Curated annotation (Swiss-Prot):
<comment type="similarity">
    <text>Belongs to the universal ribosomal protein uS2 family.</text>
</comment>
<keyword id="KW-0687">Ribonucleoprotein</keyword>
<dbReference type="GO" id="GO:0022627">
    <property type="term" value="C:cytosolic small ribosomal subunit"/>
</dbReference>
<dbReference type="InterPro" id="IPR023591">
    <property type="entry name" value="Ribosomal_uS2_flav_dom_sf"/>
</dbReference>
<protein>
    <recommendedName>
        <fullName>Small ribosomal subunit protein uS2</fullName>
    </recommendedName>
</protein>
<dbReference type="InterPro" id="IPR018130">
    <property type="entry name" value="Ribosomal_uS2_CS"/>
</dbReference>
<dbReference type="InterPro" id="IPR001865">
    <property type="entry name" value="Ribosomal_uS2"/>
</dbReference>
<keyword id="KW-0689">Ribosomal protein</keyword>
<dbReference type="GO" id="GO:0003735">
    <property type="term" value="F:structural constituent of ribosome"/>
</dbReference>
<dbReference type="Pfam" id="PF00318">
    <property type="entry name" value="Ribosomal_S2"/>
</dbReference>
<dbReference type="InterPro" id="IPR005706">
    <property type="entry name" value="Ribosomal_uS2_bac/mit/plastid"/>
</dbReference>
<feature type="region of interest" description="Disordered">
    <location>
        <begin position="224"/>
        <end position="262"/>
    </location>
</feature>
<dbReference type="GO" id="GO:0006412">
    <property type="term" value="P:translation"/>
</dbReference>
Amino acid sequence: MSVVSMKQLLEAGVHFGHQTRRWNPKMEEYIFTERNGIYIIDLQKTVKLIDTAYNYMKDVAANDGVALFVGTKKQAQDAIEEEATRAGQYYVNHRWLGGTLTNWKTIQSRIARLKELKKMSEDGTFDVLPKKEVAVLTKQREKLERFLGGIEDMPRIPDVMFIVDPHKEQIAVKEAQKLHIPIVAMVDTNTDPDDIDYVIPSNDDAIRAVRLITSKMADAFVEGKQGQDDAQQETADDNAANETVSEDSLKNLKNSVEGKED
């Protein structure tokens, strides 16, 4: 049984691509049709590719792997943080700092500074410092927390990265490629899929679409880490409660779908 149902994908708006004038020709094989100037993603392929990505993420987790979830666009920030945390993994959901992976030693020194500032605020050090100095240190801590809080406890370079919108996260993609870190990503119709190891053709702008697919990747890690079928059983229960969408229904998308904002 598939990890996610066609109905769930439709309801989350996963099938809405970008406007036809903003497309990458390499995504053609993942496009079902065009409607009102909007490309419609072939959800039959998305279902299969989610399964492939899920199984890969699960295998990485089962081998005690480390995952880094990346999504800095507003629509992805909450889902990235919440789902990575639920899976016991790590995340970057604000600006990607250049060198986060390729200059890991320097980043670790900034993380050490973040931990030092946290300790100072908790052990009473701030109470004996001048207010102006405390204000400066607090601002520094908040900035470090914003950009590095999600990887503060990451033990090493990740074994896999899940990325929402690799077109936006090009610096992260290039760093992963340089270090040969496999990438699983939500890839919209305006993105080059050649940079991605495990492509999930999907609307990467809709909050519900991002939440749905990010949660499935987190489920995969939870299942792999636990060595149990809890997440898979939840998926099966969800799918059993959903109506199936026939191939005829999918073909009728071109007559019923509404376009999304560019």
